[in-house]
Design a protein with these regions (language model features):
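Elongated, amphipathic alpha-helical interaction scaffolds
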Residues: 1-301
């Protein structure tokens, strides 16, 4: 467990704590988008979103809306889970599903939406700091769909500083290395002020207690998920072992089945924990079809 003082803004806890301050949220959005942003409400951190109880929920890092009714979902991602483009699509879909009131027929009343993901790796391999995606026509790229949806992927390791603002480059470096030395090396006055506010967060006893509680809760949830996963793995392994044993010998089949079951389930649990999908970890022990669906999602055999 890292000390609170050693966290950077790529750590979800510190990012959420920092973005609860509307000035931090506003500064980050303005630097990324290169335009003025006036927030209508206080940012909401770790906002749960679910289309219906039958489907999995998503927890967006920071949700905000401006006075033009534009919605912003801003996420940080420390590791490449190989599914971020489709995850951004999923987040956009569940946000869209809640934008219109029941019975509303005018789809033009849907808010514009920005899905912004900040990561310390280059998702697309083009060495850019920023990748912005909007719908255009494949046959004629000059034709824009203008559906109001924008997805932005930011790479803290970009190599094209001439194509973005110097302040954005400084912000991305600061997000990855949230230290006084890094802030001192920035020319941006907004980053200097942000660093002062984040220093206050890191020195807050109240925030320190919340951080410890969050860590303890996550450790307990992970342990419970592992236990459930191991139980499911044993059951699945025994079943596979019995089936295989009919053809290859019961003893050998059961042993191999148990080993393969535990191995596959362990890999699935590791993948889910990497994405903090604790609820999915709990569900796989009770829902074999859902478990198989996740195995296919992550390409686990």
């Amino acid at each position: 467990m890292k000390d609170l003082k050693d966290l950077n803004l790529l750590d979800r806890f510190l990012f959420a704590e920092a973005m609860e301050d509307p000035q931090n949220m506003r500064d980050v959005l303005e630097i990324i988008l290169g335009k003025d942003v006036v927030l209508k409400h206080l940012p909401q951190t770790e906002k749960e979103a679910r289309i219906s109880p039958a489907y999995r929920f998503a927890k967006v890092d920071v949700w905000a809306k401006d006075t033009d009714e534009v919605v912003y979902d801003t996420e940080v991602q420390g590791t490449n889970t190989k599914n971020l483009p489709k995850r951004s699509r999923y987040y956009e879909s569940i946000i869209d599903a809640k934008l219109l009131k029941p019975g509303e027929r005018d789809f033009n009343k849907m808010n514009d939406v920005y899905i912004i993901l900040i990561a310390p790796f280059d998702l697309f391999g083009k060495r850019k700091y920023m990748y912005t995606f909007e719908m255009t026509c494949k046959e004629d790229p000059s034709v824009s769909l203008e559906d109001g949806a924008t997805r932005i992927f930011l790479n803290t390791h970009g190599e094209n500083p001439d194509e973005v603002s110097p302040e954005l480059v400084e912000l991305l470096h600061y997000i990855e290395h949230t230290t006084q030395d890094m802030a001192d090396g920035c020319k941006s006055e907004r980053i200097h002020k942000m660093q002062k506010r984040i220093c206050s967060i890191k020195s807050s006893e109240e925030v320190s207690v919340r951080y410890m509680q969050r860590w303890e809760e996550m450790e307990m949830e992970k342990e419970a998920a592992r236990e459930l996963g191991l139980a499911e793995g044993r059951t699945q392994g025994l079943t596979e072992g019995r089936t295989q044993g009919l053809a290859e010998g019961r003893a050998e089949g059961r042993a191999e089945g148990r080993a393969e079951g535990r191995s596959s389930m362990a890999r699935l649990i590791d993948k889910l924990l990497e994405e903090n999908r604790i609820e999915d970890c709990k569900r796989i022990a009770k829902d074999p079809e859902f478990c198989q669906h996740l195995m296919e999602e992550f390409g686990i055999e």
